[in-house]
Structure formats: structure tokens, C-alpha cells
Amino acid sequence: LALTVADGAQQSPPPPPPAVVARQDDAPVQIEDVVVSGRSMQDQARTFVGKVSAPPPGMALARWHRSVCIGVANLQPEYAQQIIDRVSAVALSLDLVIGQPGCKANVMIVASDQASAFTQRMVSDEPFNFRPARSMTDLGGTALRAFENSTAPVRWWHVAMPVNVDTGDRAVRLHGETDPPVVAVRGASLLVGSTRNDLSHVVIVVDVHQVRGISIDVLSDYIAMVAMAQIDPEVDLSGQSSILNLFNNSDRVSHMTDWDVAYLRALYSARQDRAVATHQTREIANTMVEGIGAASEAPAPHP
């Protein structure tokens, strides 16, 4: 992949596509007798959520609240646009709005032939962009150093922002501020809180040397998945059908799967004002089971 600059934030978003669904290559096969064994679908969904999710310590999962602005740098324009189109398609399927041309990118995707050196320079130049507060917004200093020194083909860093669930006002003190923000409390409740966690921005760095031989379509699906959710960079989904296995040769898939789509849809439909983070993850797992069941019952697409 040639390293010429293409600013994806300046390019027009594609027209709204149909909702994103996992692609299916083969028609279903009729099986007369099926014996179900192993863990229940509910257990599998809870395990999937537990493995892939990586919110800041003690926090509920964050998601984009209304809109995203996608930028791609250091790729030829045609490759950059393909990534923008795919990430936009996934965002639109989650009822997000795509920023207009010229918007400030909050999903920044950068390709580099010296990924670690480039990442370290970014963090050194703008440390508060990666850790804007002492806690609650990111995975912490140890995780940031792992991000800087990662050997992964694709690395990412999410920054979330706790905000008042009713007003959207920031609910955390940032570096350099002396007084904490005042957060209005809705009322005494053990189930519902007064804040939600919104994604503020994500930086995704692609090592061009390590993604050679991978089609831009498959890579775009992988990038879209990590752009839309706080995915654990150390996630191990061996034996699970997921685009997150792209760099796991034994379990590699070529597109976003039913499990991936179900997770994103469940995340974006879950209540964000849960007072207890585990209540949110339980809701996501329950919704995933419904989504995966619906996907398995859908008719196979025509070739």
C-alpha cells in the first residue's frame, strides 16, 4: 500500500446503504436430526461480551452517541475511500450520522510503515489526547504503553467521556482543571444512573507491512469493528466466528460475522444509564442471543 496522504474526513460520505448484515457464502443445509450439546447460546454470548469488551476500569461500555467523522491518512485515495465507505456503512446501520465533508475526525485511521515509532511520536506530542483525565476515560498508563509498543498489524486506542445522561455535559475533571464538574443527580436509584459513557475519539494505526496480502474489504470490516466499540486489543476468540480473528490463521474469516453484527447492534440498543456496568453487559448478551437467532432463521441471500 503506497503511503500518500488521503484525508478521509474531507471526502463525501456514501449514500445510506442497507443495514449491515453478516454475509453468508453457502446456502443452508437441511439436517434431519440435530443433537445440541455444549454451552447454551446465552453462555456463549456472555463469554463473547466478556472477552471482546474493554471499557476503562470500573466503567460501563461506551459507544458513539450521535455522529462520527471518519478520517484516513497515509493511504492512496481509492483505498482510503473504501475504508471510509465500509466504516460509514456500519455506523449508519447503528443509526449514527456521518459527519459532513470538512468535519473534525473522531475516528482517525492512519497507515504507517513504521507503526510503533509513529504511534510513540503521536503519544509524545499529544499525551492528553490519549489520557485526558486521570481515570474513567481510557484503559490507563500501562495499556497506553502497550499501545505504543504493540506488534499487532492493527492497534487502536479509544477515549471515552462520561457525560450527564440528560444534558450531555461532561462529568469528569480533565487534566489542568481544578474543580470537578457538577453533575445533577436524577434521583436515588440502584438501577439507573445519572451519567452515560460516550466515545470521544479513537485512533487506529495500521502497520502496512503486516497487512500486505489482506484485501481492503476484509481489513475494512476489521477496522469498522474496532472503530465502533471498545474492543480488547488482547482479545482471544479462538474457535469463535468473528472478524476479530482476521490475524489468527486458524480461525480467520473474510467478513464481519453474525456474532460481530449482533454484538454491535446489542451494544447500540442497550441502555447507557445503567448504574451497574454488569447490568449493561447482561443486557447486551441477552440481546445478542435474539439477534443471532434471528440471523440464523433468515433466508439465505440470492447469489
Language-model segments: what does each one mean?
Residues 1, 58-63, 97-98, 193-195:
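Short, flexible, solvent-exposed loop/turn segments with mixed acidic/basic and small polar residues
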Residues 1-9:
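Sec-dependent N-terminal signal peptides
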Residues 10-11, 24, 280:
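Glutamine-centric residue-chemistry signal
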Residues 12-19:
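Intrinsically disordered, low-complexity proline-rich regions
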Residues 19-21, 26-39:
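N-terminal secretion/transport leader regions
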Residues 28-32, 60-75:
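Acidic/histidine-rich, surface-exposed loop or edge segments in extracytoplasmic proteins
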Residues 40-64:
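Compositionally biased P/S/T/G-rich terminal and signal peptide-adjacent segments
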Residues 71-86, 91, 95-302:
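Long, folded non-catalytic interaction modules
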